[in-house]
Amino acid sequence: MQSPIHVTSEIGKLKTVMLHRPGKEIENVYPEILHRMLVDDIPYLPIAQEEHDLFAQTLRDNGAEVLYLEDLLTDALADDNIKDEFLEKIIAESGYAAGAIHDGLKEFLLSFSTKDMVNKIIAGVRKDEIKTKYASLAELAEDKDYPFYMDPMPNAYFTRDQQACIGDGITINHMTFKARQRESLFTEYIIKHNKRFADKGVEVWRNRYPEGRIEGGDELVLSDHVLAIGISQRTSAKAITELAESLFEKSDYDTVIAIHIPHNHAMMHLDTVFTMINYDQFTVHPAILRDGGHVDAYIMHPGNNGEISITHETNLKEILKKALDKPEIDLIPTGGGDPIIAPREQWNDGSNTLAIAPGVVVTYDRNYVSNDLLRKHGILVHEVRSSELSRGRGGPRCMSCPIVREDLKK
């Protein structure tokens, strides 16, 4: 049986991709909750939607089937029993496992069509939308001045992070911060109950319930047997070890390269500072490299008796040459390595490049120095508008979850 998921590289021609079109959740963010929502700014929704539609059309124009998260989840919840189970879980994960507010939320959400219910959950539910018959003192007094019973999900359009497709399987991720943890419940129900994926042999390499944090922006599929993963603000060494154990036991993957990056908001994931764009070419933010192009990387392989062998290496080019069996590696610095341009363009996702075929990428138009440099290195660059989407702190790779890519020619 052919798996509906197949991703054996970062650069194989993109055939199927999952997106989420930004919606009302963006307009349910206000300045006092920016930090709580893990965002730095509030995009202007009409323009953000226009930009996202143009991004999606760019992918279609280059041969990709575009699926939308909200549609996949709607189809997964077609059965009333499954929908009821999902509602119980999402309401519990919003802080209301039982009680008057739980009951009020459930009644309110069931008043919508399934598609509108999904969109409402993403948008968030305000307290003034719910009428409760009775609430305990704790329910009434807790966060009395906070306007939401269910928080909005303004990061949902970054579909890279809730999961990651690796080979013929997927990780359904335990995300780091509460603001995003509910998002991967969507993935769980899509994989279990959407007819496109359910009972089709999709391996779940790691589900969302172990405590170790992991996010898809840190998971880079370098080949059909090599995975790179960031040890970052959002992904822990514990989760990387568990994923490596699963891949080594159940798949053809025999190498996991764990790369330590600064643990900060600007470089929250590996793909904000390092992306693969061709067989032997990568973008890299100079701030992660020490003198001589060095990093702290831990190369993991299957060891004896089910254990993992780990070696510490530092020369990024040599690590990649060996892992990919290439005579040379071209590391292209964000912003040309300029001390002002590089951090500015990295902040605006100049390193967050989405490859849609070998040597063909989608980038934000605002990062013109990095884009021109990519062209000088022989890369075909499709620029997309980005004035509003970039306010969310994620680029084209962040906004896309590849489901199927063509295998690379050997």
Swiss-Prot record:
Its EC number is 3.5.3.6. It catalyses: L-arginine + H2O = L-citrulline + NH4(+). Pfam families: ADI. Its main location: cytoplasm. GO terms for molecular function: arginine deiminase activity. One of its GO terms (cellular component) is cytoplasm. Gene3D superfamilies: Arginine deiminase (1.10.3930.10), L-arginine/glycine Amidinotransferase, Chain A (3.75.10.10). The active site is at 398 (amidino-cysteine intermediate). This is Arginine deiminase. The gene is arcA.
